[in-house]
Structure formats: C-alpha cells, structure tokens
Amino acid sequence: MEIKILNKTDTEIQVEIKGESHTMMNALKSCLLEDKAVKVATYDIEFPGISDPVLYVRTDKSEDPIDAIKVAAKKLADECDDFLKIFGKKAKA
C-alpha cells in the first residue's frame, strides 16, 4: 500500500491509496462517518481495475482531516482484531 496526499487544507484532504479496493475503502469511509467532526467522507475509483481509489474527507474546524483518518484507521484495525479473536474462539468449538 502506498499513500499519496493529493490536496490538503485545514478541513479537507484528498488521499490516493494505491492497491486498495472497495472493500477497504467502504470500511474506512464508514468509520470516518461515525466521527462527529467529519462532515463528508467519500471515495472514488475513476476506472475500476485500473485506477487507485482517492479518499476525500472534510471535517469541521474541530478536527484536522489527517487526525480523523488516523482515528478511523485505528478503529477499523481494532474492529478487525476483535473479529479475529471472536472468530478464532468459535472456529475452535
């Protein structure tokens, strides 16, 4: 995975995330939208199968968009860890 910041202001960011698909982007977008400071979170894959996704996030002035992405990514990682633990226990049963 490579990450390239395309545009950044105090309240907006566009980030290209190379090598990712709708699976990761939808999950990240969902976590971002749970943050009250995030006003818009969306992504676009201009040409599926060819283009890399570009994430767009806009926040209110209370949170930097980079911090919002970091918080959402941590939350997503924690949710995956929880799933793995629960699934591991059930799979042994």
Swiss-Prot record:
Catalyzed chemical reaction(s): RNA(n) + a ribonucleoside 5'-triphosphate = RNA(n+1) + diphosphate
UniProt keyword annotation of RNA-binding present: no
One GO CC term on file: DNA-directed RNA polymerase complex
EC number, UniProt record: 2.7.7.6
Gene Ontology terms: biological process: DNA-templated transcription
Enzyme category, top tier: transferase
Subcellular location: Cytoplasm
Keyword list, A-Z: Cytoplasm, DNA-directed RNA polymerase, Nucleotidyltransferase, Transcription, Transferase
InterPro entries in the record: RBP11-like, RBP11-like_dimer, Rpo11-like
Pfam families: RNA_pol_L_2
General function of this protein: DNA-dependent RNA polymerase (RNAP) catalyzes the transcription of DNA into RNA using the four ribonucleoside triphosphates as substrates.
HAMAP family in the cross-refs: RNApol_arch_Rpo11 (MF_00261)
Entry protein name: DNA-directed RNA polymerase subunit Rpo11
Organism field: Methanocella arvoryzae (strain DSM 22066 / NBRC 105507 / MRE50)
